[in-house]
A protein has these predicted regions:
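Active-site residues of response regulator receiver
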Residues: 51, 78
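Acidic catalytic/metal-coordinating carboxylates
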Residues: 32-33, 58-61, 85
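Acidic, metal-coordinating helix/loop segments flanking the phosphotransfer/catalytic sites
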Residues: 30-47
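C-terminal output helix
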Residues: 82, 101-111
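Receiver (REC) domain active-site loop signature in two-component systems and cognate sites
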Residues: 54
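Short amphipathic alpha-helix used as the core "switch/output" element in two-component signaling
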Residues: 39, 58-71
Length: 111
């Protein structure tokens, strides 16, 4: 079973995504900010779903730290969907970038 670390401060969204992804056969661990994500991240995680705007440590800073130690696939899930935000996320090492208000099937297909 593939393990996903879902990092987002929106508790309602994380609950819904956890349910969706578990129905698709994934194991899901939730972190509500970047600091918590960094403490939970280890070599058993297969994919990271990462929000940008979070308290304590935002997604951009979290992604920078992750890339120093891990080559884990990262999909940015964020309300910031401008072209500039997408390019910045990809340049910093995200493997994919999906603006919120996404279709569940699209998310699962990208995973």
């Amino acid at each position: 079973m593939h393990k996903i670390l879902l990092v987002d401060d929106d508790r309602e969204l994380t609950s819904l995504l956890k349910e969706l992804l578990e129905m698709e056969g994934f194991s899901v661990i939730i972190a509500y900010d970047g600091e918590q994500a960094l403490t939970l991240l280890d070599s058993t995680i297969d994919l990271l779903l990462l929000d940008i705007m979070m308290p304590k440590k935002n997604g951009i800073d979290t992604l920078k730290e992750i890339r120093r130690q891990y080559q884990i696939p990262v999909i940015m899930l964020t309300a910031r969907g401008s072209d500039l935000d997408r390019v910045l996320g990809l340049e910093l090492g995200a493997d994919d970038y999906l603006p919120k208000q996404f279709n569940d099937r699209e998310l699962v297909a990208r995973i």
